[in-house]
C-alpha cells in the first residue's frame, strides 16, 4: 500500500513544480570596455571616461541604451498554461545636468521593452520611448519608470516637474510621486531633492514576483545608507499583462525644443530569478567620476563676480594676477580647460595621455596614412582595452586645420552604427589630433585589394552584400535621418572601415558639408576622389546628396566586381558594367575571384542598383532611402533608361576643372574624420 501511495503522489508533486529558468545577473561599474554588452542608439554613447551618456544637451534628441541580450522574466508553471513574473532587482546611479538651473528637460526612463529598437519614438514628453500614435496602445508591452523633470505635458497629467512615475504601455503615469526620500531616523519625514541637481542620484527597484509588489527607492547617492522606507511600494498586477517571456532592460531619454539636459548613467546592476537586493553593489568610489556640472559653475561664477566687484582695487589686482598665474601654470602642465561648447562635442583629451597611448607616435603604431594626416593605434589604459585610433593632422597645413575643425564640428554629434565615432580631440602647439574608435579589421580598400594579394583570402559575397547595405544605411542617416543634411563628398573604399562582424563604418568627414533641410549648396569648389565624382561637379562644382549617391553607385560596382573605378583614364567601371548589361551579360562583371561562391540574384540586383546610382542626370538617381529598399528587396528595381550615359568630355572636365581638394584613391587610412556645429577656428588654432 505504501508503494502504491508513493506511485500515485509522485506525478502529482511533479505537476506542481515550475520550470527552472536561469538567473540573469550583471553589474557595470562604469561602461568602459562594455560596448559589446550595451546597445546604444540615437544620441546615446559610451564615453572614454566610462560614463554612459543617454543624451547631450542638444534640442529634440533621443537616446536609448539596452543590455544586449533579452532577460527571461516569466516562470512557467508546468501544471497549467499560466506564467508568473520572476522577481527582479535593479540599481543604477545617474546624473542629470540641465542647460541652466531653470531650463532643463525632459527626463529619462528605466524600461522593460520587447525590443531594444525604439525606432519612431519621439523626443520631449515621449522620452524616446513612444510616440503620439502608439502612446497607450496595449500592444506596446512596455513598462517604464519615468524620471520626469518637466511639468504640464501629457495633457496636464504631470502634477509637478520633479517627479517619478510608473507607466504601463503609456507615458501617462498610473502612479506618480514627487521626488523625495524618507529619513531613517524619522520614517515619516520627507526630504525632497531635485533630479536636475547635477549630483549623483541612486535608484533601486525591487519587484517581488509572488506578491506582485514593486518597491522603488530614490535618494542622493552620497547618503551613508539606503532609506528603509521606499518612495513607492504597492502591488502592480497590471505588470503581468505587459511582460512577455523575454524582455530587454535598459534606458531611454529625450530632450525638448527649449528644455534640454544631459542624462548620464554612472553604473548599473540587474538581477532576475534570484533574491532581491539587500544592499547596493554600486560603490561611488568604484564608479567613473560624475560629469562636470557647468550649470552649477555658472551660478558660482556670478557669486564670485559679485564678491570681486565689492572688493577693493588692490584685492582685485591681486586676484587677477593669481588667476593668470594659475592658468599659465596649468598650460605649462598641459592641463585642459573644458569650455561650454565642449559639453555638446567630443571632449578635449590631454596630449601627454595620447603621447603615452601611442608610445610617442612611433612608426610601429601607424595603421594608415592619407588625406591630411597619419593614423596611429593607441591604448588609453591597459594594452588589451580602450584601444583608440589617433589621427595626427599634417603640421603647417591650413587645409589640414580646416579639416580638423570640420571633423570636430560634425562627427562629434553624429551617432550611427555605420559611421565611425569621433571620441575626442587635442591641440598641442602645431600638433592637431583627432581620436576615434579603433577598428582593427582595416578598410574596405585593404579587404578588396591588399589582403587578397598578401594572404590569398578573398572577401566573401555575403560579406560584400552586408557591407554594401551597411554603407547605404549610413548614407541614409546622413542625408535624411539626422537633424540636418550632411553631404559626405568623399565616398570610397579607403574611407570605409570594417569591424570584425563585417559591419561597415563610413568615415573621413573632413570634406563633408552640412546644410539645413530645404537649402542648397553654395560651395562651388570641386572636391573628392577621381573616379567617384558625379559628372555635374565638372559643370557647377555643387555637391549634393545626388552626387553622394553617384559615388555610392561607383563603390557598389567596385564591391561586386573587385575592380577600381578607373585605370589610367582609359577604363571606366560604370561604362564597362553598362556594356555588359546591354549585352545581357551583367553577371560577367562579378569578381572572378569569387568563382561560383556568390548569389546571382543579389549580384544582379547590386549591379543594376549601382548603375541606377551612376545615372548622368542627378534627378534620375534614386535617393539613399530608395537604394536601401532596393537592396533589401522591399521595392522592385526599375529598368535603366536610354539616357543613362554621359560624354567623354564630361569625364575630361572632371580631370582638369579642379580648384579644390582632389585625390586619387591611393591613400589608405584606418580611421576617418568629421564636421558639424559652428566652432570658431581661432579658438581651435589658439589651443582653446
UniProtKB/Swiss-Prot annotation:
Residues 328-688 are cytoplasmic. It comes from the Eukaryota. Residues 15-306 are extracellular. It is a single-pass type I membrane protein. It catalyses: L-seryl-[protein] + ATP = O-phospho-L-seryl-[protein] + ADP + H(+); L-threonyl-[protein] + ATP = O-phospho-L-threonyl-[protein] + ADP + H(+). Disruption phenotype: Slight enhancement in abscisic acid-inhibited germination. Redundant with LECRKA4.1 and LECRKA4.3. This is Lectin-domain containing receptor kinase VI.3. It comes from Arabidopsis thaliana (Mouse-ear cress). The gene is LECRK63.
Amino acid at each position: 500500500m505504501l508503494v502504491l501511495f508513493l506511485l500515485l503522489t509522485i506525478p502529482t508533486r511533479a505537476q506542481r513544480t515550475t520550470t527552472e529558468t536561469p538567473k540573469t545577473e550583471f553589474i557595470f561599474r562604469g561602461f568602459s570596455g562594455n560596448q559589446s554588452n550595451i546597445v546604444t542608439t540615437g544620441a546615446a554613447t559610451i564615453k572614454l571616461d566610462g560614463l554612459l551618456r543617454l543624451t547631450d544637451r542638444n534640442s529634440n534628441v533621443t537616446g536609448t541604451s539596452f543590455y544586449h541580450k533579452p532577460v527571461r522574466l516569466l516562470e512557467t508553471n508546468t501544471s497549467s498554461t499560466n506564467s508568473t513574473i520572476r522577481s527582479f532587482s535593479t540599481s543604477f546611479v545617474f546624473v542629470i545636468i540641465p542647460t541652466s538651473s531653470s531650463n532643463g528637460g525632459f527626463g529619462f526612463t528605466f524600461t522593460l521593452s520587447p525590443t531594444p529598437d525604439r525606432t519612431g519614438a519621439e523626443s520631449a514628453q515621449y522620452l524616446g520611448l513612444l510616440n503620439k500614435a502608439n502612446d497607450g496602445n496595449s500592444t506596446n508591452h512596455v513598462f517604464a519608470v519615468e524620471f520626469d523633470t518637466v511639468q504640464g505635458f501629457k495633457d496636464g497629467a504631470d502634477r509637478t516637474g520633479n517627479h517619478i512615475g510608473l507607466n504601463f504601455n503609456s507615458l501617462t503615469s498610473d502612479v506618480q510621486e514627487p521626488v523625495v526620500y524618507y529619513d531613517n531616523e524619522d520614517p515619516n519625514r520627507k526630504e525632497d531633492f531635485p533630479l536636475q541637481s547635477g549630483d549623483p542620484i541612486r535608484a533601486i527597484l525591487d519587484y517581488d514576483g509572488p506578491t506582485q509588489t514593486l518597491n522603488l527607492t530614490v535618494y542622493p547617492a552620497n547618503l551613508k545608507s539606503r532609506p528603509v522606507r521606499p518612495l513607492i511600494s504597492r502591488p502592480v498586477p497590471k505588470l503581468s499583462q505587459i511582460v512577455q517571456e523575454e524582455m530587454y532592460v535598459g534606458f531611454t531619454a529625450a530632450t525638448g525644443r527649449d528644455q534640454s539636459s544631459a542624462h548620464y548613467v554612472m553604473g548599473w546592476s540587474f538581477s532576475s530569478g534570484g533574491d532581491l537586493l539587500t544592499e547596493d553593489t554600486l560603490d561611488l568610489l568604484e564608479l567613473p567620476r560624475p560629469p562636470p556640472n557647468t550649470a552649477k559653475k555658472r551660478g558660482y561664477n556670478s557669486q564670485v563676480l559679485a564678491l570681486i566687484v565689492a572688493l577693493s582695487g588692490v584685492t582685485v589686482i591681486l586676484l587677477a594676477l593669481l588667476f593668470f598665474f594659475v592658468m599659465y601654470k596649468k598650460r605649462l602642465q598641459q592641463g585642459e580647460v573644458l569650455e561650454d561648447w565642449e559639453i555638446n562635442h567630443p571632449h578635449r583629451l590631454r596630449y601627454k595621455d595620447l603621447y603615452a597611448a601611442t608610445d610617442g607616435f612611433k612608426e610601429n603604431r601607424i595603421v594608415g596614412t592619407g588625406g591630411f594626416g597619419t593614423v596611429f593605434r593607441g591604448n588609453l589604459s591597459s594594452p588589451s582595452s580602450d584601444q583608440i585610433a589617433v589621427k595626427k593632422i599634417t603640421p603647417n597645413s591650413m587645409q589640414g586645420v580646416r579639416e580638423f575643425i570640420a571633423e570636430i564640428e560634425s562627427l562629434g554629434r553624429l551617432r550611427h552604427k555605420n559611421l565611425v565615432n569621433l571620441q575626442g580631440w587635442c591641440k598641442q602647439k602645431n600638433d592637431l589630433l583627432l581620436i576615434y574608435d579603433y577598428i582593427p579589421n582595416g578598410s574596405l580598400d585593404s579587404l578588396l585589394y591588399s589582403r587578397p594579394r598578401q594572404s590569398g583570402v578573398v572577401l566573401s559575397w555575403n560579406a560584400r552584400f552586408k557591407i554594401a547595405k551597411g554603407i547605404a544605411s549610413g548614407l541614409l542617416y546622413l542625408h535624411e535621418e539626422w537633424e540636418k543634411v550632411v553631404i559626405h563628398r568623399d565616398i570610397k573604399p579607403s574611407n570605409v572601415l570594417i569591424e570584425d562582424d563585417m559591419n561597415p563604418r563610413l568615415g573621413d568627414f573632413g570634406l563633408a558639408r552640412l546644410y539645413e533641410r530645404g537649402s542648397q549648396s553654395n560651395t562651388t569648389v570641386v572636391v573628392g576622389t577621381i573616379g567617384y565624382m558625379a559628372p555635374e561637379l565638372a559643370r557647377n562644382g555643387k555637391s549634393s546628396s545626388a552626387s553622394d549617391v553617384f559615388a555610392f553607385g561607383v563603390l557598389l560596382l567596385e564591391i561586386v566586381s573587385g575592380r577600381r573605378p578607373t585605370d589610367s583614364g582609359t577604363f571606366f567601371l560604370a561604362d564597362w558594367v553598362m556594356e555588359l548589361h546591354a549585352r545581357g551579360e551583367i553577371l560577367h562583371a562579378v569578381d572572378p575571384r569569387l568563382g561560383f561562391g556568390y548569389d546571382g540574384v543579389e549580384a544582379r540586383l547590386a549591379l543594376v542598383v549601382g548603375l541606377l546610382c551612376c545615372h548622368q542626370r542627378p534627378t534620375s538617381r534614386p535617393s539613399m532611402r530608395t537604394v536601401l529598399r532596393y537592396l533589401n528587396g522591399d521595392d522592385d528595381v526599375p529598368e535603366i533608361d536610354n539616357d543613362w550615359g554621359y560624354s567623354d568630355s564630361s569625364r575630361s572636365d572632371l580631370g582638369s576643372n579642379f580648384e579644390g581638394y582632389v585625390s586619387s584613391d591611393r591613400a589608405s587610412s584606418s580611421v576617418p574624420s568629421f564636421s558639424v556645429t559652428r566652432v570658431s577656428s581661432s579658438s581651435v588654432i589658439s589651443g582653446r
